Amino acid sequence: YMFAAMHRFDYTIDDCLEFHDSIESVCQPLRHKNDEDRKQKLGLEKLRPWDMGVDIRGRPPLKPFKEVKEMVDGCSRIFHSMSKELGDYFDLLEANDCLDLDSRKGKAPGGYQYYLQKSRIPFIFMNAAGTQRNVETMIHEAGHAFHSFYSGHLQLIHERDAPIEFAEVASMSMELLTHPYWGE
């Protein structure tokens, strides 16, 4: 029923079941092994949610930037190293004041990318505090923004939005694709 209701036509129920089986047979055992290693290295009998973010070597959290401008400049260098077009798109966000990244009193929590339909320029919102996670979030949201730039030429507004099954593909892929450039 849901396949018909959601107008899904590019993959089948059998594809979903096969994907589930693949995760169960390949990813689950790897996750269990990693969890066991984490438990052992932390000297715990049982892992709890708050144990998952702890560095098992006891290293302090990374502080890759002090000022938001440093993060923006670093991300720009990363994107320009990957592709002139990506770098130019990212710089366009800054030039058009479409990056609201500084934390400040009274600012809503979270991070997101929002496509401004009239100007057809994405807007990125987050609360940067100098952490590695902030850099990852910026790159993730930039992935959404790049997807918006590339779909912005479409005439109908509804064609510019990605369906829920695809919405995170561009952003999560951008996180992975940028890894080789993080020394920039």
Regions found by a protein language model. Give the residues of each.
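Cation-handling catalytic/transport regions enriched in His/Asp/Glu
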Residues: Y1-E184
